[in-house]
Amino acid sequence: MSGENANSIGSDVTSLIQPGLEQVMQDEGVQVSLINSVLGWCRVHIINPIKTSKIVQSRAFQITMVVLGIILLIAGLALTFVLQGQLGKNAFLFLIPAVIGLVKLLATSVCMEKPCTPEKWRLCKRLLATTEDILDDGQINQSNTIFTMNSSESTSASAS
């Protein structure tokens, strides 16, 4: 009986919180704070133990990882846009190195103790939106469902 009571209380609390939660999650400041919290947890529990190894502490390793991330990102995006006409819907396969490069750059940023900024988050959202747009039907046609850009973001993206 007490289990049913706890479930009803939990659903009542959820129904009270949920309408405001969606609006709060649209705020870029909240998104960046949430990302920094998750990155902080990852830094303490995953990154710091890895960083104590001698090879990761070397500057050569860090520079190599940054260069590798940039090369993967640029090569993946370039191949996607250059070969999309010839490959059609299969051109999205070239986004795999770009996504790996993006993840590598973000991980390197975390390893170098730099927090996520609103600019980095906007760049990441734009790249994820473009990736989703290509992955869903092989074309860039703003058919995103998950990573959508607000009208203010799309106007600032077209202005720059």
UniProtKB/Swiss-Prot annotation:
Keywords: Membrane, Transmembrane, Transmembrane helix. One of its GO terms (cellular component) is outer membrane. The gene is srp. This is Sulfur-rich protein. Disulfide bonds: none annotated. It is found in: Membrane. It holds the Pfam family CRPA. InterPro entries: CRPA (IPR008436). It comes from Chlamydophila psittaci (strain ATCC VR-125 / 6BC). The chain crosses the membrane at residues 63-83, 92-112. It is a multi-pass membrane protein. It comes from the Bacteria.
